[in-house]
């Protein structure tokens, strides 16, 4: 038997704000709020095949590019429309040396955590 990813934990300055951003991006809902921690996940709740995201408050600033990032896919619109939606939600473009020929967009959430918007290649859940 193998393990599966059930939670991804993100250290951040504003757990509630970052949780709200990622709820908008992923269509997730807030599942639990305990102290300085906010957990979000699919509407199905805990135990879903998709992992939850936990945002924990930290006072330590981000110092370098993360070695792990999320890739997201639009499920109900094309990549250009999804890019516009994500930018309106608070994402911003990030230049990491792309050539312009890539099939993805590199973005950052409101606290500067990088993620990529890929071409649509998944079905809605």
Question: Which residues does each predicted region cover?
Answer:
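Vicinal oxygen chelate
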Residues: 2-12, 32-33, 39-42, 46-56, 60-83, 103-108, ...
